[in-house]
Amino acid sequence: MWGSLCKAPLLRLRPTFAAVSNVKTIHIKASPDYNEGIDKSKPLKFSTSKASHRHWTVAKSLGSNQQRPWWKVVPLSVFLTTVLLWAIFRKETDIDEAIYKPIEQLQDESENK
């Protein structure tokens, strides 16, 4: 009983191959990207395309709600910059010296204890 009820609507909703192919050709010919006259031996220029950094924004690709407000970005950037500068300019400690010792020397020290 359920099989006969479900088959009829599915058959009516399924588009035919001819209808789908006609829609695809109409869409291809009607789209502004359809270009017969472009010389395909030359490369496309990125600087003039819509993907260029002059045209692209986060709001265009991800939506305007994906942009982070400056008051969230600036403190994180300052913190990471501070940590990086501290790691570069700090003085070496005993721990650093122990880390840079060769493994053989550390094994000899542990055996002598």
Swiss-Prot record:
Signal peptide (UniProt feature, chain positions): 1-18
Residues in compartment: Mitochondrial intermembrane: 90-113
Membrane topology: Single-pass type I membrane protein
Main location: mitochondrion
Alphabetized InterPro entries for the sequence: UQCC4, UQCC4_vert
Annotated keywords: Electron transport, Membrane, Mitochondrion, Mitochondrion inner membrane, Respiratory chain, Signal, Transmembrane, Transmembrane helix, Transport
Domain of life: Eukaryota
Bilayer-crossing regions: 73-89
Keyword Translocase: no
An example Gene Ontology biological process: mitochondrial respiratory chain complex III assembly
UniProt topological domain (Mitochondrial matrix) ranges: 19-72
Record carries keyword Iron: no
Localization terms from the record: Mitochondrion inner membrane
PANTHER family per record: PROTEIN CCSMST1 (PTHR35268), UBIQUINOL-CYTOCHROME-C REDUCTASE COMPLEX ASSEMBLY FACTOR 4 (PTHR35268:SF1)
Record's function text: Required for the assembly and stability of the mitochondrial ubiquinol-cytochrome c reductase complex (complex III (CIII) or cytochrome b-c1 complex), a multisubunit transmembrane complex that is part of the mitochondrial electron transport chain (ETC) which drives oxidative phosphorylation.
Similarity section: Belongs to the UQCC4 family.
Name of this chain's protein: Ubiquinol-cytochrome-c reductase complex assembly factor 4
Gene that encodes it: uqcc4
